[in-house]
Amino acid sequence: MNTATQTVSDLFDAELRAAGQLPVEVHCHGFGPVDFSDLDALDLDGLEAACVAEGVCAIPTLYLHRDCLDAFEAMVGTYAARRADGELRHIVGIALEGPLLASHGGTPAATVWLPTRGEWERLAACGRNGLVYTVMSPDAFAAGSGLEGEIDPGAPRFEDFVPLLVSSGVRPALGHFSRKDPSRSAAFVERIIDLAWQSGWTGPGLPVVTDHLFNDMPLAIRHAFRTRRARAERDETVASYRLEEWTMDRADEILGPVPAAIMRNAAAGRIAACINFDGEHVDSDIAKRAIELMGTENTMIMTDRCDSARLGRQRLHHEADNTLWYQQDGVVAAGSQPLSRQVTNAREHGFRDDEIWQLIAGTAHRVFALSGAGTPGRP
């Protein structure tokens, strides 16, 4: 947690802050000692106080064990009631990472599961109490998905639950892809986005967002250089990509079908894409070029942040070469850099302050239809 007296907003001129917006942590897993996914220990008052101290709003992002659905419903009910009473003004929504994931990546495996129709209805009902998005894999039902063995002919499909979620204010957040068939996965990206827009969404905001671009998806490039050995090759590798020559019409060829589909739809204003700017989830120059192509107005910086060495009932650890959190098997589980540090990184890579403000505040307020300190909008 940031213990400095200077808040994230204080890093910017008053003119940029004049609209009354605050920066938004749009995807984060833990502030201070609390793991948001530990529903027994989740301290909403502590999170609110941390947000005030850092000068941010937050959308805490939880992993959900199937046996905790009752507790999750109770938590969002309490959250909504307190918001209605004017409390928790800096906690501007709740999010889930999963449970419908084709590749669990750094997500605890026990929090990846295939909801029944009734469970989707229960999750959708949480929309009225502040659930603003759930990360899901567009290729979750395809060959190569980690859920493949659990899918039976009667399992609800996207056509059954995406309209239900979206009409309840719960956005699909696209991520955690299989690597088996990138072209097919990209086609499913388009399908989910079409379904969301055809599901009666009338705004405010947008009906689809993403998990972090370039992570947990099939790629045609090396997107990150996390070890000392990898960084020794970094400059030569990134130079070979000729970033300045990247164009959206060549994104499939350069980056691969899945990131290209996401970036194309973001640039068209149909979705908003999240990207991490800690320089470790994604190389900062690659992230910068992707943002330039999509537009800052269509992009949100996310931290994927966890402040403690525990997340979703699993122990985490740091490696010597970076600030990321790792699972025991060496898979990246989360980031640890707060938004203030990512602001500094964005400045060092040539973004103007008005562009950075758009990335950490403006786009999120538009996409989630926030007002004042933040009130999530509903369709």
Regions found by a protein language model. Give the residues of each.
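Divalent metal-dependent hydrolysis catalytic cores, especially in the metallo-beta-lactamase
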Residues: 25-38, 45-72, 88-103, 127-146, ...
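N-terminal hydrophobic targeting/anchoring segments and the immediately downstream early-domain regions
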Residues: 18-22, 49-56, 78-81
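Metal-dependent catalytic neighborhoods of phosphoester/phosphodiester hydrolases
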Residues: 69-79, 105-108
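Glycine-rich beta-alpha junction loops
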Residues: 98-100, 213-219, 277-281, 303-309
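Extended, charged catalytic domains and RNA/DNA-binding interfaces, predominantly
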Residues: 115-252
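His/Asp/Glu-rich metal-coordinating catalytic cores
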Residues: 89, 106-113
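His/Asp/Glu-enriched, well-ordered alpha-helical/loop segment
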Residues: 221, 226-275, 289-378
